[in-house]
């Protein structure tokens, strides 16, 4: 898949520069590292580095989506609910939440300098952000190497929000499992992989309001299903996507793509991600077969 070619090229270029620096004599190394910062060594231009507009290799994906409006965003400010900022107000409205986590990136420090690790992890994170933006995602929060994203909003169908979340995370997972894996295999680096959790909360289950104080605040959601997205990420297998049963229901995607989350022995890890025995509420976590879905 050449959709992420620009991102892969950037990672390869940064790794190549690191090899050159390491091969230099100590005196030259000392001089070279003084200029070895994120901006000077990054293969991306400053405009592309700080823009939400995806890199050129993702253009075919954008075109397949039709007219995609890429607008600048602020973390913690979904445009449909940013009016709640600096208020005591709240509002109920559905949303699909997705938590994308990148695993094993700390192992890069065994082989590369902090500057190179920064460039590699930032490039991977940008690939996730750009992919989600193409599918209408709103970047809510960056958590370490991870990305927390909202899909949906006012004027967007509930089905579309869930399908867009599945599409975005499926493409990104393919990138990590295949394209990115090849780069690190060539370098003898331990696998970097992703784990993703997605859940949908309906209008009466998601409360939007402000968390924090002043500038140390964000417009966020208070919902069981927002919390469960992160929890489902935790039980996903390497390069797996785990979704709540609401996602299956609201997306209307064929049930053949959903199954119990199973371990390497084929045994079910966890049938219910949340249980409230007093209310007889048992909420399923399901593995989403993104690979077959993309075929």
Question: Where in this protein do the model-derived segments appear?
Answer:
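Broad hydrophobic/π-residue packing in well-ordered secondary structure
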Residues: 99, 105, 124-125, 142, ...
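Short, mixed-charge, low-aromatic patches
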Residues: 76-88, 125-135, 183-191, 207-209
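Catalytic NTP-binding/metal-coordinating core of nucleotidyl cyclase/transferase enzymes
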Residues: 83-167
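N-terminal low-complexity, intrinsically disordered segments
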Residues: 48-89, 109, 114-122, 126-127
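Short secondary-structure boundary segments
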Residues: 63-90, 133, 137-152, 195-197, ...
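Short hydrophobic/aromatic-rich motifs at helix boundaries and adjacent loops
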Residues: 74-78, 99-102, 120, 200-203
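Intrinsically disordered, glycine/charged-rich C-terminal tails and inter-domain linkers
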Residues: 1-77, 238-295
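Catalytic beta-strand-to-alpha-helix segment of the class III nucleotidyl cyclase homology domain
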Residues: 13, 154-271
